[in-house]
C-alpha cells in the first residue's frame, strides 16, 4: 500500500505542538485593518490551539503522519 500524502494546504496552515495539539495562526489579519481597534489587532497576534473534533479530524484525515 502506498504512503499517504499530507495535504499541502494543511502543512502551510497548521503545525503540531510536542504535546500533539494543533497550532493555528489567528484568522482575520489580511485586510480591512483600519476598521479594527488596536486591541482587536493585538489580540489577533500569535497563534492559538485547535481543540475538539475539528483538530482530531484534521490530524486523522489530512495529516496522516502527524501523530504516530
From Swiss-Prot:
GO terms for molecular function: structural constituent of ribosome. Pfam families: Ribosomal_L35p. Belongs to the bacterial ribosomal protein bL35 family. GO terms for biological process: translation. The keyword Metal-binding does not apply. InterPro entries: Ribosomal_bL35, Ribosomal_bL35-like, Ribosomal_bL35_CS, Ribosomal_bL35_sf. It comes from Orientia tsutsugamushi (strain Ikeda) (Rickettsia tsutsugamushi). GO terms for cellular component: cytosolic large ribosomal subunit. Transmembrane segments: none annotated. This is Large ribosomal subunit protein bL35. PROSITE patterns: RIBOSOMAL_L35 (PS00936). HAMAP family: Ribosomal_bL35. Keywords: Ribonucleoprotein, Ribosomal protein.
Amino acid at each position: 500500500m502506498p504512503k499517504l500524502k499530507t495535504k499541502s494546504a494543511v502543512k502551510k496552515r497548521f503545525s503540531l505542538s510536542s504535546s500533539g495539539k494543533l497550532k493555528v495562526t489567528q484568522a482575520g489579519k489580511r485586510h480591512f485593518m483600519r476598521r479594527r481597534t488596536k486591541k482587536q489587532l493585538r489580540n489577533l497576534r500569535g497563534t492559538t490551539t485547535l481543540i475538539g473534533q475539528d483538530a482530531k479530524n484534521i490530524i486523522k484525515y489530512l495529516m496522516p503522519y502527524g501523530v504516530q
